[in-house]
A protein has these predicted regions:
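A structural micro-motif
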Residues: 2, 28, 48-49, 90-91, ...
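Internal alpha-helical scaffold of NAD(P)-dependent oxidoreductase catalytic cores
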Residues: 103-113, 129-167, 178-220
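Small-residue helix-packing motif on alpha-helices
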Residues: 30, 40, 57, 195-203, ...
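Short pre-catalytic strand/loop immediately N-terminal to key active-site residues, enriched for Gly-Thr
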Residues: 4, 164-169, 225-227
Length: 230
């Protein structure tokens, strides 16, 4: 296994790192740069190699048999994070929301092979679904590498980039709608006299069981709704 470098060590990057470690990826082959000392302390506890400076991390990655770089910073700091960086000849996988392949290409050296991904919040517990789009310069090996890394967060689907905005609206924002629906069910149970912990357990397991039925039986969603209302 080669080394992987992370620019940004926030929650999603940390979830990816934990997933990789659980899959047996060596901690000493994971390099992470983040300016926040608290994040570096958290990352250090995972026995990966934390760096304060992005370029220093990339230089170290370049000395190794590197596999790729994951860009995992907030959208508002992308330009600052990438300014003036020299990259090793490796693919760059971006999980930055709202940044297209073309926008990233304007910020990165011309020779960099770029991939774009959109994970969702259930990825934080290894149960997410991530859409992946590869740039024109990427080869099959680059995409396979990205799929491996993103697989640490859950399921991965390949989509053309023109569909990424639709993906963002559905699976990217979708968990928020599910959480609000569950909160309404829980509140309804409380209003009907249930203790909140019991109402929460009932609502969450009802949702989990319903989703498992959809996954395993493959029938149309509305068919189940009609069965429940019959």
């Amino acid at each position: 296994m080669g080394s992987i470098g992370f620019i940004g060590g926030g929650l999603m990057a940390t979830a990816m790192i934990k997933g990789l470690l659980q899959q047996g990826y060596p901690a000493t082959e994971i390099l992470v740069s983040d300016p926040d000392p608290k994040r570096r302390e958290i990352l250090g506890a995972l026995h990966v190699l934390p760096f304060q400076d992005n370029q220093e991390m990339l230089w170290e990655l370049g000395k190794r048999e590197g596999e790729g770089v994951v860009l995992a910073v907030k959208p508002q700091v992308v330009k600052e994070a990438l300014a003036g960086l020299t990259f090793p000849f490796l693919p760059v996988l971006s999980i930055v929301a709202g940044y297209s392949l073309a926008a990233l290409a304007r910020l990165l050296p011309a020779e960099v092979r770029i991939l774009r991904a959109m994970p969702n919040t259930p990825a934080l517990v290894g149960a997410g679904i991530t859409a992946l789009s590869a740039g024109a310069k990427c080869g099959e090996a680059d995409q396979k590498w990205a799929e491996k890394v993103l697989g640490s967060l859950g399921k991965v689907v390949i989509v053309p980039e023109r569909l990424m905005n639709a993906v963002t609206g559905l699976s990217g924002s979708g968990p928020g709608f599910v959480y609000f629906l569950l909160e309404a069910l829980i509140d309804g149970g409380v209003l009907a006299g249930l203790p909140r912990p019991l109402a929460r357990e009932l609502a969450v397991q009802t949702a989990a069981g319903s989703i498992k039925m959809l996954q395993e039986l493959q029938e149309h969603t509305v068919d189940y709704a009609r069965q429940e209302l019959a």
